[in-house]
Amino acid sequence: MYCDIIMVQDKLEFRKYRFMKEEILHITDGDYFNNYFTKKIGGFAVPFREVIMDGEVVDIVYSDEFIKLRAKTLNVSENEYRSKMSVCEILSKNIYSTIYLWFGKDTFCQMNLLALLVYLEQIKYQGKLILNYIDDVTFEQIESNIDVKLGVYKKIYRDVLISKYKPKELGVLEARAVDLYFDYHSNNGMLATLIKNNANKSKSELLSLLIEASKDYGMSDLQAERLINFYLTIS
């Protein structure tokens, strides 16, 4: 009888452990780190796949209008864009008591993080949110276990990404990343000036120069190439 009780308790503890494990979700800043995370750290992790720093957005994240606009910006079909929305699908179930966010501090990651936080506000996520800032090159943690309080990010999203204005309140977001977002889109910004001043160089030389200068922006090679083509065309 005693053994039976112990076995029942063990089963209950095991089920409790499984339930607790299933309640935790990790959201990463892209496929590259996500693959590293699942192999080296472990746990259920999904990547947030977007390039919010490019193009425009609308008020409601992942609305039909948002998807249509973002698909056009990223030059993919709406179906292809939807196929990359694993975060949206998982979060819409709203079953996780704790979500860990793993993002970098560069502009690319910060604008994506902003959109994600707004989506969490939209679905009225009530669980615990913990942010870990990472180095996107070494994957080392820069800052850990930052408690994130929702409720302020919708306004920040509207101010920064729609009205193109830097508010005083930024929550957990990095002020420098927001500044560089505006610089990235400025015809007189650091990157635009760099391209214009080196227009006589070959495209490969200019690309290397731009990538080296834009580490804090977090730009991809493709983004850098688009930026070069844009400013060389209008210069």
Question: How would you describe each model-predicted region?
Answer:
Residues 21-23, 96-98, 126:
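A general structural motif
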Residues 110-168:
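Long, charge-dense
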Residues 75-91:
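Glycine-rich, highly charged phosphate/nucleotide-binding loops
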Residues 142-210:
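A conserved mid-domain beta-alpha-beta active-site/ligand-binding segment of alpha/beta enzyme cores
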Residues 47-52, 126-139, 221-225:
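A generic structural motif
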Residues 27, 98-108:
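Acidic beta-strand-to-loop metal/phosphate-binding motif
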Residues 192-194, 212-235:
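Charge-enriched amphipathic alpha-helical scaffolds
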Residues 2-80:
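A structured, charge-rich N-terminal accessory region that forms the first stable segment of a protein
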